[in-house]
Amino acid sequence: MQLNSNEISKLIKRRIAQFDITCEIRNEGTITAVGDGVIHIHGLTNVMQGEMIALPSDQFAVALNLERDSVGAVVMGSYLNLSEGMVAKCTGNILRVPVGTALLGRVVNALGVPVDNKGVIQCSCYFPVEAVAPSVIDRKSIDEPIQTGYKSVDSMIPIGRGQRELIIGDRQTGKSALAIDAIINQRYSGVKCIYVAVGQKATTVANVVKKLEEHRALSNTIVVIASASESAVLQYLAPYSGCAMGEYFRDLGEDALIVYDDLSKQAIAYRQISLLLRRPPGREAYPGDIFYLHSRLLERASRVSSDYVERCTHGKITGRTGSLTAIPIVETQAGDVSSFIPTNVISITDGQIFLESHLFNSGIRPAVNPGISVSRVGGSAQTNIMKVLSGGIRTALAQYRELAAFSQFASELDDVTRKQLQHGQKVTELLKQKQYAPMAVSCQSIILFAAVHGYLEDVEVSKISDFESALILYMTYTEKELIKIIDHDGVYNIDIENKFKSILETFKSNQSW
């Protein structure tokens, strides 16, 4: 058989023309060191801060240290199956978590993966865990209250929608209880809630979830958990993940409330990560950017303008403002609020509620110290009726504390001083409240009215609690229409004042308590 060179040439040219070489450019590196959840990768280029890095066995790491010739990253999950020499690849993606209404009523980890055995969460929307806070132009002034249901907080330390209000105190002083009751009080208000548990025992969080379910508040709440048994990176990321979930509702023109319980443990987790990444330690061995850790998180809580909401929804929602209210919790040691993390967070937030051990142990619960607790938003975040009636409460308590200090050294007291001391004791007793029993504005209002207008003068201190319970019960059954008006409008006028006087006079004439 004779071969034709022309045919062979044509065949080769046709095969060359049909030959398809696909080029795949990958940014790969080699793991050079593994230990304590931290890996160092050599050879990666153009890596972003916070970028997801793909590892063998479908694992991921987050790039935190960008050095000249290597990348330091923290592994999300177990690092025990990783070893030197393995390949790591850039993904080009920043860490994102699922957001949306499908998460309400669920318990998820720091990555948005459900851990409550209720099935997979179907989410079509994902938000980055790190986001830029709304600018000054995009924000709106805070003028709407978020009711906690506590008389002492709503009257003296009001919290507004879009505010950052710190709860600070020693362990076992009722910090979490106050925040959880604030969530329970939102069950009928339409405010979406996110509870972020960082570094807590899983059994403690399970009890919180159970209580939220019992009080019909879980269906309106997302619980994000990074328990004490989980890695430091998940404890560090959990508050940012919860914040992203809250921003979804804020950007839709809705109101959301997020509780960070607590940021002290997040700071400890971040310190652990930073030391493992060989970052230079500073005060109390915390890294130099520990302030930025909390400031960039808490600055994302805000009340945004209707223009911002319209821009975020591409014109689908107009004329509505959104808000994300943050209640961070910080634990102190022996009441020392001048240590590093407490002073940082105090300087970032718009006020703080101090809870004190000696008040808690003496039976005053919530153990709020009204002298050093403050809300920088103040009366602009209160309803009209609470603003009018609460002024006398703070004054009465301030006078009581001052006189109580001097009365210890005085052998005899005049009648005026004795009356002021008795009034202060009654107001202190009146502000006590049981856990899981948040109170509506209407009920708080008539109790404060009774205290301010002298209706407690003939009531003994030991009978204050019974007087309060009986008064609320009486008002609930006899004045349903008035309760609706006050809870809806929050106005205070001469008609409501006369109505309150009539209710109290009729109630006291019955002596039903």
From Swiss-Prot:
Residues binding ATP, per UniProt: G169, D170, R171, Q172, T173, G174, K175, S176
Entry superkingdom: Bacteria
GO molecular function, one term: proton-transporting ATP synthase activity, rotational mechanism
InterPro entries according to UniProt: ATP_synth_asu-like_sf, ATP_synth_asu_C, ATP_synth_asu_C_sf, ATP_synth_F1_a_nt-bd_dom, ATP_synth_F1_asu, ATPase_a/bsu_AS, ATPase_F1/V1/A1_a/bsu_N, ATPase_F1/V1/A1_a/bsu_N_sf
Example of a GO cellular component annotation carried by this entry: plasma membrane
UniProt keyword annotations, A-Z: ATP synthesis, ATP-binding, Cell inner membrane, Cell membrane, CF(1), Hydrogen ion transport, Ion transport, Membrane, Nucleotide-binding, Translocase, Transport
Coiled-coil blocks: none
Catalytic activity: ATP + H2O + 4 H(+)(in) = ADP + phosphate + 5 H(+)(out)
Record site: Required for activity: S373
Matches recorded under SUPFAM superfamilies: C-terminal domain of alpha and beta subunits of F1 ATP synthase, N-terminal domain of alpha and beta subunits of F1 ATP synthase, P-loop containing nucleoside triphosphate hydrolases
Enzyme Commission code: 7.1.2.2
Location in or out of the cell: Cell inner membrane
Main location: membrane
Topology of the protein relative to the lipid bilayer: Peripheral membrane protein
Gene3D superfamilies for the chain: 2.40.30.20, ATP synthase alpha/beta chain, C-terminal domain, P-loop containing nucleotide triphosphate hydrolases
Family: Belongs to the ATPase alpha/beta chains family.
Function noted in UniProt: Produces ATP from ADP in the presence of a proton gradient across the membrane. The alpha chain is a regulatory subunit.
NCBIfam families xref list: atpA, PRK13343.1
Subunit structure: F-type ATPases have 2 components, CF(1) - the catalytic core - and CF(0) - the membrane proton channel. CF(1) has five subunits: alpha(3), beta(3), gamma(1), delta(1), epsilon(1). CF(0) has three main subunits: a(1), b(2) and c(9-12). The alpha and beta chains form an alternating ring which encloses part of the gamma chain. CF(1) is attached to CF(0) by a central stalk formed by the gamma and epsilon chains, while a peripheral stalk is formed by the delta and b chains.
Descriptive protein name: ATP synthase subunit alpha
Organism listed in the record: Blochmanniella pennsylvanica (strain BPEN)
Species classification: Bacteria, Pseudomonadati, Pseudomonadota, Gammaproteobacteria, Enterobacterales
Name of the gene this protein is made from: atpA
